[in-house]
Curated annotation (Swiss-Prot):
Part of the 30S ribosomal subunit. Residues 1-11 have a biased composition (Polar residues). SUPFAM superfamilies: S15/NS1 RNA-binding domain (SSF47060). Belongs to the universal ribosomal protein uS15 family. This is Small ribosomal subunit protein uS15c. Keywords: Chloroplast, Plastid, Ribonucleoprotein, Ribosomal protein. It comes from the Eukaryota. The gene is rps15. It is found in: Plastid, Chloroplast. SMART domains: Ribosomal_S15 (SM01387). GO terms for biological process: translation. Coiled coil: none annotated.
């Protein structure tokens, strides 16, 4: 399994202090999404994992929506650093 190096996005000190921050949660959800996506490429009929992936995608989308309403600059930086698409509804 290939590990994604998103530690550059949030430093180790910030992880300890702000484990519940929106950015940290989005990064951890993105790691889970990428891991589940690679799993589902091998196991196409794993419907339980597909359901879990959809739930995590929804959670990440809600957090990104919240962040875009509260602080647009932090939202744009996070989107660019994680290389994920911006939502069409924003």
């Amino acid at each position: 399994m290939v590990k994604n190096s998103f530690s550059s996005v949030i430093s180790q000190e910030e992880k300890k202090e702000n484990g519940g921050s929106v950015e940290f949660q989005v990064v951890s959800f993105t790691n889970k999404i990428r891991r589940l996506t690679s799993h589902l490429e091998l196991h196409k009929k794993d419907y339980l994992s597909q359901r879990g992936l959809r739930k995590i995608l929804g959670k990440r989308q809600r957090l990104l929506s919240y962040l875009s309403k509260k602080n647009k600059m932090r939202y744009k930086e996070l989107i660019n650093q994680l290389d994920i698409r911006e939502s069409k509804t924003q």
